[in-house]
Curated annotation (Swiss-Prot):
Gene name in the database record: rpoY
GO cellular component, one term: DNA-directed RNA polymerase complex
Source species taxonomy: Bacteria, Bacillati, Bacillota, Bacilli, Lactobacillales
Catalytic activity: RNA(n) + a ribonucleoside 5'-triphosphate = RNA(n+1) + diphosphate
Role of this protein: A non-essential component of RNA polymerase (RNAP).
Alphabetical list of Pfam families matching this protein: RpoY
Protein name: DNA-directed RNA polymerase subunit epsilon
GO molecular function list: DNA binding; DNA-directed RNA polymerase activity
Amino acid sequence: MIYKVLYQKDKIVNPRRETTQTLYMEADNMVEARSTVEDNTPYNIELIQELTGNSLAYEKEHADFKLTKFDKK
């Protein structure tokens, strides 16, 4: 499954909508997606959303869609 992860670059600064960034990743479930991002980055995760059907098609067409791959630990 493909997940859209909204995050802030670090956990120290208070989150602001204007600085929220996005990455797209593949994972078996939402728990795995969260743990993978937490284990490999210093990011403050705001939201993880599963993308399917029309949502996935929209993101591929209208966003800077690129799957992020993390090394397995």
